[in-house]
Design a protein with these regions (language model features):
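Radical SAM enzyme core and accessory elements
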Residues: 1-4, 255-263, 268-273, 297-341
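Canonical Radical SAM [4Fe-4S] cluster-binding loop centered on the CxxxCxxC motif
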Residues: 3-39
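A short acidic, helix-capping loop that chelates divalent metal ions and anchors anionic groups
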Residues: 30-32, 117-124, 186-191, 434
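Radical SAM/AdoMet-radical enzyme domain recognition
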Residues: 39-60, 66-184, 196-197
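Flexible glycine/acidic-rich beta-alpha junction loops that bind and position SAM and/or redox cofactors
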Residues: 176-196, 220-234, 269, 468-476
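C-terminal accessory region of radical SAM enzymes
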Residues: 199-233, 259-312
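Short, small/polar residue-rich loop motifs at catalytic or cofactor-binding pockets
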Residues: 245-249
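A compositional/biophysical signature of low hydrophobicity enriched in polar/charged and small residues
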Residues: 336-478
Length: 478
């Protein structure tokens, strides 16, 4: 199987940082860390990436501007055909630094702002004055011709402020607004209580989808693969070209000591560039191979009709269960196959069955009924009702098999399914390729339906297998 090349590679240039953010994945701080890559090793990393791909190279940290050769490595990456961008808190960007960023070939910086005011932002970032310093840095970058992307980490504390943060980004002259949905990694583990519930994720991403349809900014939620499902549900497949989780398929993360991970929040070591070149790790690591195969996904992610465009957040699955292929723990969507299974196996005989089923699946009665009707319109459900034993109520039944030319199978199947006397209709992979059951008030009526269908469908080869003894088997279609 051919392996795609990475579209983005994030490299943690250092773990030093002048802020103390409560959610920091890297648990970064003022002190340096032993074992960080040297400039020579950084050049070797760039050479390895450039040997087989030309991705966006995200220079991140910590605070990458505290890496003494950050501009040299950015320029080197640019010369190799990569597109360097900078993930910075912007507090260190004065006019001179902004000029150096631009001269190094860095065309965009991403800056994290989490609240629309200094008091709350500074508290979240752990340093007084961080908000105003970041705004000054953004202004200096914009003046130097550098594009600015504003990132906002969304938690319970600011989920109702996403619209305000978007408006702030626009006022600051940003080109893009990327809401980040909290992943419990690094110091972020201590903020798990501030993380959104599955339904809050759903509601927040729905709001962002509507915001994106009206905004002049580029809006892209990050660490939110469910967004690709939501925009398809709200806008349709025609306007959707993106994919959810890119970990291991289009994205990789290189840590400050050379460890390679599927993403920065995905705390699983795929290899180390000091031991093996980056291209080999990308091509051969088992975790990457697993992530490239959606058939390996488990739980409701494995059953989901959106698994190829969403995939669930593998970092959240790993953090919650220890298994990166487990189901996404913060997804409220009920896959079609899960609903179908519940309808077939556990349909309740009560006054309001859809309320009962919805309660079991975590959706409301209206949504459960509408989803069921949608499955019916799409042909996945033929009927919902009691299955009676024809012989017990004086009726007759027979199993019929038609021999249909393969090119006419769909046409004939539709004609057969249109008859209310037909209770089952399915294909089999042999010469008798269309099978169905007919139930009518007596044997003569059954015979008339069979003859009418043969005539209307232009079929001469038919088997009639009338029921002699009934055996009830539990058949569930997935």
């Amino acid at each position: 199987m051919s392996v795609s090349v990475p579209r983005l590679v994030a490299w943690e240039t250092t773990r030093r940082c002048n802020l103390r953010c409560g959610h920091c994945r890297a648990n970064a701080g003022n002190c340096g860390c032993d074992g960080e890559l040297s400039f020579a090793e950084a050049k070797a990393l760039v050479d390895g990436i450039a040997s087989f791909a030309k991705p966006i190279l995200i220079l991140t940290g910590g605070e990458p501007l505290l890496c003494e050769w950050i501009f040299d490595i950015a320029g080197y990456a640019k010369a190799k055909g990569l597109r360097p961008v900078l993930g910075t808190n912007a507090t260190l960007i004065d006019a001179a630094t902004a000029k150096k960023i631009a001269e190094a070939g860095i065309g965009r910086i991403s800056v994290s702002l989490d609240f629309p005011d200094a008091k709350r932002h500074d508290a979240f970032r752990g340093v007084d004055g961080a908000f105003e310093a970041a705004k000054r840095g953004i202004a200096n970058a914009t003046e130097a011709g550098i594009e600015v992307q504003i990132n906002t980490t969304v938690t319970k504390k600011n989920r109702d402020l996403v619209g305000e943060m978007h408006d702030l980004a626009a006022r600051l002259g940003a080109k893009a607004f990327h809401p980040f949905l909290l992943v419990p990694a690094g110091r972020g583990k201590s903020l798990e209580d501030a993380g959104l519930s599955a339904q809050e994720y759903e509601n927040t991403l729905g709001f962002i989808c509507r915001l994106a349809s009206e905004s002049k900014l580029e809006i892209k939620p990050t660490d939110a693969p469910q967004y690709q499902r939501i925009i398809r549900q709200q806008c349709g497949d025609a306007v959707c070209t993106g994919k959810g989780c890119l970990a291991g398929t289009g994205f990789a993360f290189v840590g400050h000591t050379g460890d390679v991970q599927p993403c920065g929040y995905f705390e699983f070591r795929a290899g180390n560039i000091r031991e093996k070149p980056f291209p080999e790790i990308w091509r051969d690591a088992k975790v990457f191979a697993d992530l490239r195969n959606p058939d390996l996904l488990k739980g409701k992610c494995g059953l989901c009709e959106y698994r190829s465009v969403c995939g669930g957040c593998r970092a959240r699955a790993l953090a919650a269960s220890g298994d990166y292929l487990a189901e996404e723990p913060f997804c409220a969507h009920v896959p079609d196959r899960v609903l179908l299974k519940e309808l077939q196996e556990n349909f309740p005989v009560v006054d309001r069955p859809y309320a009962e089923i919805g309660k079991r699946l975590g959706i409301d009665e209206r949504q459960c009924h509408e989803r069921t009707m949608s499955l019916t319109r799409r042909g996945m459900i033929r009927r919902i009702g009691a299955s009676l034993n024809p012989g017990k109520i004086g009726y007759s039944s027979t199993l019929v098999a038609f021999k249909v030319p393969p090119e006419r199978l769909d046409e004939v199947a539709q004609k057969v399914s249109a008859y209310e006397e037909v209770t089952h209709n399915y294909s089999r992979d042999n010469e008798w390729n269309l099978w169905f059951t007919i139930v009518a008030e007596n044997r003569g009526a059954v015979k008339r339906v069979v003859e009418t269908l043969k005539r209307e469908c232009g079929v001469s080869d038919a088997l009639e297998l009338p029921a002699e003894k009934t055996y009830k088997l539990k058949a569930v279609f997935s």
